Amino acid sequence: MFATNPFAALSASIPPAVIQGYVVLMIVLVAAGTLFDIVHKGSARYFFDNWRRSKAKGGKPIGGGELFSIAAQTAVVDVLASGEFCNARRRVAHLLTMYGFVLHALATAVMVFAYPTAATSTPAIWPLLWWLGGLMLLLGGYWFWFFIRVDVAAEGNTPFRVVHADLFVLSLLASVTLGLIWACLQANGSAASGIFCGLYILATTVLFAGVPWSKFAHMFFKPAAAFEKRVSKANGTADNLPTLTRDDPEQQARHSMELLRNAPMDMGLGIKREAPRHY
């Protein structure tokens, strides 16, 4: 089962060209939905306007080498390592979901386009990556949904409470869950595999066609926002936020109370000793 290309087996009932056309259509829907989201919300215009305002304030000029370094830091720390999450559990869940999605989607594309039928033998690594990516995604996604979500963990709401903002997460989990169930049933020759194949296609269509109404496009916006934030810190404008911190001697000298002048850097962080579960 873990070494079998489920899409090659599906080609016996659905022509490979139809399967490939469906995948291409989903890619087009993501691109079109993201562009619509950019225009509708004005995200790109906001970033460019913010960039121009930052330069107009006369901050420290940034050279090409420093800009490349900032881009590399953004890619490694903020994107690949999800460095924006200070909560370790939230970061691990996000990384499992993100890398699981990448592996699952990549393996799907390779198996559909490079090995579309049983006549073309599929290397065992691709079905294995498809399963591994799917299981990683489900582990991270369900962990987040039932135990880490702020409205569940900190506000005491039931994990079965669904709002519009949950469209992306729920459709993603539904797509991968139904896909793995379908592949398992198909490998075992179950008659129910056809039903789950239809449900898998439905959930996947909702996931990719619902980009304008979900958080799907945030995966493209967040790297741009992280890069702009690092640039604003480097040129000194810092998005109009204070740049002095408590470890700065000038900031410490401003306090009239001796206690605050010599206070340890971790003073006042007692609120972090216990999770906010007193709902």
Language-model segments: which ranges?
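Detector for conserved single-position "signature" residues within domains
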Residues: 270
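Membrane-embedded alpha-helical bundles of multi-pass integral membrane proteins
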Residues: 1-244, 248, 255-256, 273, ...
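Extracytoplasmic/periplasmic C-terminal soluble domains
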Residues: 182, 263-264
